[in-house]
Amino acid sequence: MSRQINAVTPSSSSRRHRLSLSRRRINFTTSPEALPSSSSRSQPSSSSRSQPYSSSRSQPYSSSRRRRRQERSQEQRVSEDNVQIIGNANEPLTRTYHSQGVTYHVHGQVNISNDDPLLSQEDDTIESVDRASQQYQNSIASETAAQRALQRGLDLESQLMSEISPRSPAYSPPYPSNDVLSQSPDLFDSPQSPQQHELELEDEDEEEEEEEGEEVEVSCNICFTTLKDTKNVDSSFVTSIDCNHAVCFKCYVRIIMDNSTYKCFCSASSSDFRVYNKHGYVEFMPLTLIRNRDSIKQHWRELLENNTVNNRIIDLNDVERLERERSELRAKNSQVEHKMTMLNCDYAMLKHEHKITELKLKWANRDLEEFTKKTQELQSTVNDLQEQLRKQVAESQAKFSQFERRNSELVAELYTIEMSKP
């Protein structure tokens, strides 16, 4: 059995309540309208987009595109959470099962054995699941029909509103000869053609957003002014339809003002011009030429009032303040550099003094060791002399006592002799 499941399978306890094909084979053949396919699930999003499309001129295109993208991602997450695929998803759908709030799609010829835990119930359970799946398919079919009716009503309402609403004074119809969108017959095949066109534009915008634009420096062929444009996205140059020499807008206006007709440096004259961007190009031609030196002054006056914040006094004050701050920072930087130089000098001197002190300490330790040795030698000599002196004193005392005793004996003997004489 080869089976591929693209979602988290339920636990073993919930598998006991699923379909069983041990005694008979269940084959649900559902029509494409009743299947919970991506088209039926995307109906609410398309219906929700139909009304904003009728008023797309009053809302920014970026916000509606972001909302549609969020709805699409949310629907995709919900569909992926509730659908499991068995078999190869590239093969055609053969069977569909629904149990425990999860829809199982079987693609291709999948051999499912009778001992599969997905199919572990008796016939009565099969009949109940059969009825539940039939009710689910009926509810899906009714919901799909209601969504289609709602979508049809919204499309008719938007079509009526577009026909009834008056056009604005600034409305300019597209050129039927050059506009590719107006020539496409697909826009008039069904009431959902505006939504399809909008989805196509959205897909194109998403593809363009994924591609990172490369900024390229391009120079004008006349004034050689270098402009930076994004490759394959936008262009700041005007191109004649008779030659391929692109010029900037300033040179184009100057040539028109000088010659009344545009004549390129390659001697090619033309009255039609093109300006390109990522969506296509715009053809235009100069209609009216008015020579008035005050018009540029009025134009710049409006630019300074509406497009820029250009106050000469404020700019000068800012420049003076920045110059002052730069001077102060330079002075502080000089002081810091001077302090760093002094500190480096002090550090070098302290480093030398440290080395000298270490050398002196080494010498002092050596002298201390020598003095300690000499002191120990002298101490041993003093001890020897003291011992010798003690011995000499003891010998002297013994000798003196012996002399005294002998002297007393001799004196007594002499006295005895003198007394014995007649």
From Swiss-Prot:
UniProt-recorded Gene Ontology molecular function terms: transferase activity; zinc ion binding
Post-translational modifications reported in the UniProt record: Auto-ubiquitinated.
Annotated TM spans: none
Pfam families in alphabetical order: zf-C3HC4 (PF00097)
GO cellular component: host cell nucleus
Localization terms from the record: Host nucleus
Keywords: Coiled coil, Early protein, Host nucleus, Host-virus interaction, Metal-binding, Modulation of host ubiquitin pathway by viral E3 ligase, Modulation of host ubiquitin pathway by virus, Transferase, Ubl conjugation, Ubl conjugation pathway, Zinc, Zinc-finger
Coiled-coil annotated residue ranges, if any: 314-414
Biased segments, Basic and acidic residues type: 71-80
Biased composition (Polar residues): 1-10, 179-196
Reactions mediated catalytically: S-ubiquitinyl-[E2 ubiquitin-conjugating enzyme]-L-cysteine + [acceptor protein]-L-lysine = [E2 ubiquitin-conjugating enzyme]-L-cysteine + N(6)-ubiquitinyl-[acceptor protein]-L-lysine
Zinc finger (RING-type): 220-268
Enzyme Commission no: 2.3.2.27
Gene Ontology biological process terms from the UniProt entry: symbiont-mediated perturbation of host ubiquitin-like protein modification
Biased composition (Basic residues): 14-26
Chief localisation class: host cell
SUPFAM superfamilies tied to this protein: RING/U-box
Segments of this protein annotated with the region Disordered: 1-86, 165-215
Start-end of Low complexity biased regions: 36-63
Acidic residues bias locations: 200-215
Its biological purpose: RING-finger E3 ubiquitin ligase that plays an important regulatory role during the initial stages of infection. Migrates to specific nuclear foci early in infection supposely to prepare the sites for viral replication by targeting and ubiquitinating host proteins.
Oligomer and partners: Homooligomer.
Family listed: Belongs to the alphabaculovirus IE2 protein family.
Protein name per UniProt: E3 ubiquitin-protein ligase IE2
Species name: Bombyx mori nuclear polyhedrosis virus (BmNPV)
Lineage of the species this protein comes from: Viruses, Viruses incertae sedis, Naldaviricetes, Lefavirales, Baculoviridae
Gene transcribed to yield this protein: IE2
